[in-house]
Amino acid sequence: MKTFLILALVATTATTAVRVPVPQLQPKNPSQQQPQEQVPLVQQQQFPGQQQQFPPQQPYPQPQPFPSQQPYLQLQPFPQPQPFLPQLPYPQPQSFPPQQPYPQQRPKYLQPQQPISQQQAQQQQQQQQQQQQQQQQQILQQILQQQLIPCRDVVLQQHNIAHASSQVLQQSTYQLLQQLCCQQLLQIPEQSRCQAIHNVVHAIIMHQQEQQQQLQQQQQQQLQQQQQQQQQQQQPSSQVSFQQPQQQYPSSQGSFQPSQQNPQAQGSVQPQQLPQFAEIRNLALQTLPAMCNVYIPPHCSTTIAPFGIFGTN
């Protein structure tokens, strides 16, 4: 038991010799310091030769200084803006050369005219007279179409009475036509009344020609209808129904067949119609001047009718 106690004491002394005293942290506030109980250290017994010497601690390596930092690269200054070049002035517009005036056209009348001979002067006068006559005829023709129709009907009524025609107008209608005819004749100049009378006579002749053509066409249509009826009676009933459209074709042609007269004769007085023209002219000269109390030159009864003047229906 003693040996055991001795060994325990040796062990404790060895451990206490090695233990390093730890410094106690003192509190910041002195008021908070509390007294600590001091534990009495056990007296270390020194045993010769038993303490081991620890090797001296090597000093910590000193930290190597950091390499000196390289200075930052100096920022290069921005390039200074170059001054703008002075702007060149705009090029002045080139002055155009003055335009040359257009060459003036020389009027034709400035050219020296050749002297006109007497024959040429007469021809020009004749041409002017013909043109004036044509213009007068056209004007009178228009007057006839619009104004002298009542005179035509009045003279035509007298002609029908003289020839005992069935186309006789009523008394009231005849009086109205007389008034209208006289009003139109008074508006026509005296020098043109003879031409107006001739136009009235011409219109009457054209009207009679048209009536004759209509009568001829009606007679032809009646004859064709009679021939068709006779053919239908002679043919059997079976053939009639088959050939009936063919038999109707000539009847349609009847209304378009031209008369046997010369086509150029239509619209103008022909030489063979001069006796008829003279008869109607005398009747018009007896009726119209006395009825309307207008003056008509005496040469109007002897002049020849103008050919080629168209009348109205």
UniProtKB/Swiss-Prot annotation:
Post-translational modifications: Substrate of transglutaminase.
Region span, Disordered: 22-122, 234-272
Record field: compositional bias (Low complexity): 22-55, 102-122, 234-264
Cross-referenced InterPro entries: Bifun_inhib/LTP/seed_sf, Bifunc_inhib/LTP/seed_store, Glia_glutenin
Alphabetized UniProt keyword annotations: Allergen, Repeat, Seed storage protein, Signal, Storage protein
Signal peptide: 1-20
Origin: domain of life: Eukaryota
PANTHER family, A to Z: ALPHA_BETA-GLIADIN MM1, PROLAMIN PPROL 14P
Remarks, miscellaneous: The alpha/beta-gliadins can be divided into 5 homology classes. Sequence divergence between the classes is due to single base substitutions and to duplications or deletions within or near direct repeats. There are more than a 100 copies of the gene for alpha/beta-gliadin per haploid genome.
Protein name in UniProt: Alpha/beta-gliadin clone PW8142
Species this protein is from: Triticum aestivum
